[in-house]
Amino acid sequence: MAKGGNKKATAAARAAANRLLADNRLARHQYEILDTLETGIELVGTEVKSIRAGQANLRDGFCLIRKGELQLHNVHISPHSHAGSYFNHDPLRTRKLLAHRREIDKLRGQLDRKGLTLIPLNLHLKGSWIKLTIGLGKGRKLHDKRQEEKRKQADREVKSALARY
């Protein structure tokens, strides 16, 4: 007997295995993202449960390179609701990010340029692993944000005009 299985079920399983857990939409507005990198993140058990429940906030987060390690700061992961206070984690603790040495060295070289920063963009599942996508961003000024908004509005108008014809 063949073990083909249901193709719809396998596609659904793949989609569930690669789902978005938290997104930092404000970062894409405040920064021009020049480069992205997918990293692992060192978590404790209650943090994993909270992230899978969708209780992570990346909005105020940033990354630093200290002692040759990537560190994630100021990301709030709510304490797990079913764990006691003794076993729970600190919501704002510094978390270590897992990346290859050459990737960290490349980021360090780029960060030495003026005005660049590392910001968390999203948390997602890749198989059973929780991954963090970080971005190398350059802060936008107010006039840059306005120009970007005007460009997006013009693109929307062109798209709607083409759809009408």
Curated annotation (Swiss-Prot):
Entry keyword set: Cytoplasm, RNA-binding
The keyword Hydrolase is annotated on this UniProt entry: no
UniProt key word Glycosyltransferase: no
A Gene Ontology molecular function term of the record: RNA binding
Pfam families from the UniProt entry: SmpB
Main location (coarse class): cytoplasm
Annotated compartments: Cytoplasm
InterPro entries: SmpB, SsrA-bd_prot, SsrA-bd_prot_CS
Function: Required for rescue of stalled ribosomes mediated by trans-translation. Binds to transfer-messenger RNA (tmRNA), required for stable association of tmRNA with ribosomes. tmRNA and SmpB together mimic tRNA shape, replacing the anticodon stem-loop with SmpB. tmRNA is encoded by the ssrA gene; the 2 termini fold to resemble tRNA(Ala) and it encodes a 'tag peptide', a short internal open reading frame. During trans-translation Ala-aminoacylated tmRNA acts like a tRNA, entering the A-site of stalled ribosomes, displacing the stalled mRNA.
Family of this protein: Belongs to the SmpB family.
Name the record gives this protein: SsrA-binding protein
Species assigned in the record: Prochlorococcus marinus (strain MIT 9303)
